[in-house]
Amino acid sequence: MKKILLCCNAGMSTSLLVQKMQKDAAARGLEVTIEARPLNEAMDHLDDASIVLLGPQIGYAKGDFETACAGKNIPVDVIPMADYGRMSAAKIIDGALAKIG
């Protein structure tokens, strides 16, 4: 099972997105778990992640996450502002799964 880890400043805004993503994944029968963590906790939850998606408001932290994930073969990406703002769950899931491979 693949795990998508979303990260934002406090975990609040992404929690709504996670709910939409979970609903979309279930409707499509995808074997994926999706969870949100605030920035100050996310680094402690990388080991079982298949991909880390950062909210656009913390895109500045991408380099730090790439460094932390480098030896673990975990891709890191920033969710595009338009997709994040529109809560485009399916588009975000599809992008994440494409990067995971």
Short names for language-model regions:
Residues Q19, K23, T67, D94, ...:
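Short, well-ordered alpha-helices that flank and scaffold nucleotide-derived cofactor binding pockets
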Residues A10, Q57-G59:
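Short glycine-rich anion-binding loops that position phosphate/pyrophosphate groups of nucleotides
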Residues P38-A42, A61:
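Short acidic active-site motifs
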Residues A61-D83:
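A short, gly/pro- and small-residue-rich
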Residues L46-I51:
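Short acidic/histidine-rich motifs immediately flanking catalytic phosphotransfer sites
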Residues K3, P75-G101:
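Ser/Thr/Gly-rich flexible loops in soluble cytosolic domains mediating phosphotransfer, phosphorylation
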Residues K2-L39:
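Conserved active-site segments centered on acidic
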Residues A25-L30, A70-I74, G101:
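Short helix-capping segments at alpha-helix termini
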